[in-house]
Design a protein with these regions (language model features):
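C-terminal SET catalytic tail plus cysteine-rich post-SET Zn-binding segment of SAM-dependent SET-domain
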Residues: 2-3, 99-164
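Catalytic cores of histone-lysine modification enzymes
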Residues: 5, 10-106
């Protein structure tokens, strides 16, 4: 399995990653936003935390739902396909955003998405990755405010949108 990843992760990654991790992850109320995913035990840097699962569907079939803040679509394949966790999804759909994440989402060549630990994660710590949302319209303060970030990190961008 070829893994495309940033230099923030170790060169050798744990490629054995289950679709569900009740032994490792707990979904519960988050101080950041609604529900969140928390580590039931410590996780080492480079470990695969979970696969982000759901039905792979064309972006065009869900574009009208994308503005609904309760959606959990994960865009893949150059924005033409999304993973819809409403069908066949798992606890990964509850992972919240942070501008200072402890995990990173990695898309495989086959369109599967895995969440890897960027650093050691302590038992009880909430799991985060940077959503880095992309928009088709020009980036303005109004557009950024439509996807506000509440992560509270020292380096918070104030938006879920990708850094410019």
């Amino acid at each position: 399995m070829d893994v495309m990843h940033s230099t923030a992760l170790p060169a050798s990654l744990d490629l054995d990653c289950p679709r569900s991790r009740p032994d490792l992850l707990d979904v519960r109320s988050s101080p950041i936003d609604g529900r969140g995913v928390f580590a039931r035990r410590s996780i080492r840097r480079g470990d695969c935390v979970i696969e982000y699962t759901g039905e792979h569907i064309p972006w065009s079939s869900v574009a009208d739902q994308a503005d609904d803040p309760r959606t959990y679509f994960f865009g893949i394949k150059d924005g033409t396909v999304v993973i819809n966790p409403e069908r066949g999804g798992n606890e990964a759909r509850w992972i919240n955003h942070s501008c200072d994440p402890n995990c990173e989402a990695i898309e495989e060549e086959d369109g599967r998405v895995f969440i890897y630990a960027l650093r050691d994660i302590r038992t009880g710590e909430e799991i985060f990755y940077d959503y880095q949302l992309e928009v088709d319209e020009p980036r303005t303060p109004l557009v950024e405010s439509e996807s506000p970030c509440h992560c509270g990190a020292a380096n918070c961008r104030g938006t879920l949108l990708a850094p410019v």
